[in-house]
């Protein structure tokens, strides 16, 4: 959590203003941070809350459950009767996510699908008001076709960690060779969602970079 794309003083000041939440998920959040589980950064969490309160999504799809924290968090701000489908492939995290969802009494609201997101997305149908992608960064570009198919008109796509601690802005030659494929794929992803005829996208330097895309209806598509 030490790598920041914003000045550390600004980040710490923003975090100092954060208030207690109405939900009781702080123990799940702090345990995940202590164990270096990659959950959303505090300021990204607040952005998610704002988007859920604005959009009032009845159906959310999450790619990358980790230990279930962000699903539980988003669900606590969804309208009554709102549901979430979340996907995770890491067995250790799946076990913890199931435990957390059960302990919060949210098994009716949150469905955890286990396995590879690319395969699971292909098999899903229906329409989601908000889709949150927070998984392996090199896979975002491979998720996109199915994510767009599953996103409702005027639905919101939130992609987390898109600035890669600032690396995405650097030349590929400044990136370690082993990270260059991910670097290229994320750049391709950001270019695609910024220029896609169905999407209006803004990229924010929040947390480790968040892209927010709105799926335009047929009549509103960019000319």
Which positions does each model-derived feature cover?
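A short alpha-helical cap/connector motif
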Residues: 1-130, 137-158, 162-223
């Amino acid at each position: 959590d030490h790598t920041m794309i914003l000045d550390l003083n600004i980040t710490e000041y923003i975090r100092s203003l954060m208030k207690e939440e109405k939900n009781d998920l702080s123990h799940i959040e702090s345990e995940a941070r202590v164990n270096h589980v990659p959950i959303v950064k505090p300021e990204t969490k607040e952005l998610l809350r704002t988007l859920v309160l604005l959009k009032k999504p009845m159906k959310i799809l999450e790619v990358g459950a980790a230990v279930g924290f962000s699903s539980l968090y988003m669900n606590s701000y969804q309208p009554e009767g709102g549901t979430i489908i979340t996907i995770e492939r890491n067995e250790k995290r799946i076990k913890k996510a199931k435990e957390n969802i059960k302990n919060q009494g949210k098994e009716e609201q949150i469905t955890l699908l286990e396995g590879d997101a690319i395969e699971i997305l292909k098999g899903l149908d229906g329409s989601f008001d908000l889709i949150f992608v927070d998984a392996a960064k090199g896979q975002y570009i491979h998720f996109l076709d199915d994510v767009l198919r599953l996103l409702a008109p005027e639905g919101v796509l939130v992609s987390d960690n898109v600035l890669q601690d600032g690396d995405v802005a650097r030349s590929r030659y400044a990136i370690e060779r082993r990270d260059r494929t991910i670097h290229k794929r994320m750049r391709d992803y950001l270019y695609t969602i910024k220029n896609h005829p169905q999407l209006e996208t803004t990229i924010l330097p929040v947390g480790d970079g968040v892209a927010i895309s709105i799926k335009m209806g047929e009549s509103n598509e960019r000319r």
